[in-house]
Amino acid sequence: MENILEVNQIKKYYKIKTGLLQKTQYVKAVDDVSFSIKKGQTFGLVGESGCGKSTLGKVIIRLEDATSGSIIVNGEDITRLQGKKLRKSRQQYQMIFQDPYASLNPMQMVGDIISEPILNYKKLPKEEIKKEVLYLLKCVGLSEDAYYKYAHEFSRGQRQRVGIARALALRPSLIVADEPVSALDVSFQSQVLNLLKDLQEQFNLSYLFIAHDLSVVKHISDVIGVMYLGHIVEIASDKEIYENPKHPYTKALISSIPQIDKHNNNRIILKGELPSPSNPPQGCSFHTRCPIAKDKCKENIPQLKDIGDEHQVACFYENKVGDLNG
């Protein structure tokens, strides 16, 4: 199966203002990240707040420029595209944002919000555009009268459906969904997740699904990448990640998921706070919180390595992770 997205050694650093004679410092929000997404696949990207996952999503769709590395969408390197070439490429990839209200123009009716990208990219009669917008509203489970309403007239879940319809307007092949259900009540989260799965099949979509909640990611993803302090520390199929985690951070995340059928006495409690990306620890970025860290981890940075079954992990002692309680 062909890759729709290839992310190669992407870095995104932000300069920190320092004194005139001081050495330039950087916040390493994304640090040497590589992965790929196949056509029709959902890649779930999970990690704590501040790990760099949302920044990575913005870099991938060119809302932010990468410091280095390359992003290839449908075989085209979009990393340094500018002007008309960048504008043309944007039809292939769109984003669903975390806060549907903040991402929708309160001064526009829903019909105008969804039709705006179509007007910007396609020369179609107004009647055809309206017909297309009404079709998209139907696809996301909204009635035709939504066309003439404003965003504030809808619930959070309905506003997110409007955002999804807008993302579909140009028929992209790749959608980056940045925490698309985190602002919704639990009762509505599953509805939106099921909608995304239905739309994926209907429109032949691929997703980069970003979330901090592993249980949400499990519901929708084919492959899961676990991110920590700017690095991806593990990649595997959803089943492999949950049944055979090989990174201690992944193991800790899984142990924190509430279990209905058992008491969660084996939860792995990570000590300490997430280090600052402006001052990351030397060696493995996780060693300051890792229950199995050794001296080697304090001095060397583990690289993602293939351990079979399309399972990759960045850990020197992955064979000891199974001994952890959780």
Regions found by a protein language model. Name each.
Residues 169-173:
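A short, proline-enriched helix->beta-strand linker immediately N-terminal to the Walker B motif
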Residues 2-3, 17-21, 237-326:
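Short catalytic/signature loops enriched in Gly
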Residues 21-24, 78-94, 120, 240-245, ...:
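ABC ATPase NBD coupling module
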Residues 69-77:
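Conserved ABC transporter NBD signature motif
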